[in-house]
Amino acid sequence: MAMETKSCQQLHIFFLPFMARGHSIPLTDIAKLFSSHGARCTIVTTPLNAPLFSKATQRGEIELVLIKFPSAEAGLPQDCESADLITTQDMLGKFVKATFLIEPHFEKILDEHRPHCLVADAFFTWATDVAAKFRIPRLYFHGTGFFALCASLSVMMYQPHSNLSSDSESFVIPNLPDEIKMTRSQLPVFPDESEFMKMLKASIEIEERSYGVIVNSFYELEPAYANHYRKVFGRKAWHIGPVSFCNKAIEDKAERGSIKSSTAEKHECLKWLDSKKPRSVVYVSFGSMVRFADSQLLEIATGLEASGQDFIWVVKKEKKEVEEWLPEGFEKRMEGKGLIIRDWAPQVLILEHEAIGAFVTHCGWNSILEAVSAGVPMITWPVFGEQFYNEKLVTEIHRIGVPVGSEKWALSFVDVNAETEGRVRREAIEEAVTRIMVGDEAVETRSRVKELGENARRAVEEGGSSFLDLSALVGELNDLAFGGLVE
């Protein structure tokens, strides 16, 4: 009789994504994956972020609970409910403050719904203690891979950069399976007393107290670092990616991350790609947060034109009558050869198109996984966050991309590389595009990333490494919910 009762019960998981597309998109996919394994999944988000999840809720894959975002109380503009809208360092601090102010409201929602588990973004450091109050496990979601997690932990623990003579002097990151060299200029720089730095420091200690970590990666991509994270750093972790593979239908891929209703047929860029030869087009996109200075955009435009390669370029700029960031006559000369998209683009569908030969990326983890999954080589251009670590995985460990020469971590997401010192020159862009698209090196790089892409697909299939890890986690959470107590 007890077994019958247990089988009738359904595991209910709450998901709390950080309010930024790069965090919300993969956590939505993760909720869909848990749902496909029989769990009831509820995402908690704010009113202005709700449209991001509307398609999944309409299909009945997930449920949605709204929570008020305290923009005004934190000193933010009333409609600022996403980190994608942050334009200054001061706004970043206020946004972090706002994420702490929602804690009591979230606690009330938990009390009302009583889920069996909480999956919360790493930026919500308070979520572990809140989950403990309700005697449910809190799972961490970082939004990056094992390599970056290991590298950042080593840098924070050992401080190998503290006694260098200059920002450009290199150092070896200690206690890693490979010899990885970096410079101080490539590391995150936040004032010690900033809200963001306080949160990062607290996150390490709180992560150790959480039930475990969900990682959007697959074992075959970073086996040494998956083992290192678990055995050397002692973290309990499950690899369940690439989570984007949960979107199997064309419509799901087209709508992923879009607030507007969107279908593949509506995207002219896909029709444009249909007219191109296989592996002939360079796709250029720097994610949802990076806003380059006009001077850097001019270098990109000139470098792309000089390369002679066809391209699709996603630019976060509204069209104006006079655009100083474009070389004179650029769009006229590039007709049929280059396509500029000034809005959201269906990235997964673009990368999966046979015409795409390379991807110029900011090395956000979602973008790297999507490129690997599609078997597309990369030109790496890290900007902030853990992106300089991610670049090392791509260019040195797997050799599935070439660096463009970005050397300086950006403190602000806006007007990136406005100063001459950090700007990537057109010659470097042209050279990187040529390296990744033409010659023997390009062929070898493409072969390596294609093999990884096949491994990625196998990992999420029944019996694959990610499928098995997710199944084991769901089984463990069911046992905790219906057969035991949180350890």
From Swiss-Prot:
The keyword Transferase applies. Optimum temperature is 45 degrees Celsius. Strongly expressed in achenes and receptacles. The active site is at H23 (proton acceptor), D121 (charge relay). GO terms for molecular function: flavonol 3-O-glucosyltransferase activity. Its EC number is 2.4.1.91. SUPFAM superfamilies: UDP-Glycosyltransferase/glycogen phosphorylase. It catalyses: a flavonol + UDP-alpha-D-glucose = a flavonol 3-O-beta-D-glucoside + UDP + H(+). Optimum pH is 6.5. Keywords: Glycosyltransferase, Transferase. It is an enzyme of class 2 (transferase). An anthocyanidin binds at H23, G385. Induction: By de-achening. By injection with salicylic acid, with transcript levels increasing by a factor of 5-6 at 4 hours post-injection, remaining stable until 6 hours post-injection and falling below control levels at 8 hours post-injection. Down-regulated by synthetic auxin naphthaleneacetic acid (NAA). UDP-alpha-D-glucose binds at A345, Q347, H362, W365, N366, S367, E370, E386, Q387. PANTHER family: GLYCOSYLTRANSFERASE, SCOPOLETIN GLUCOSYLTRANSFERASE-LIKE. Broad spectrum multifunctional glucosyltransferase. Catalyzes the formation of flavonol 3-O- and 4'-O-glucosides during fruit ripening. Accepted substrates include several flavonoids, hydroxycoumarins and beta-naphthols. Uses UDP-Glc as a sugar donor, but not UDP-Gal or UDP-GlcUA. May also be involved in detoxification of xenobiotics. Belongs to the UDP-glycosyltransferase family. This is UDP-glucose flavonoid 3-O-glucosyltransferase 7. The gene is GT7.
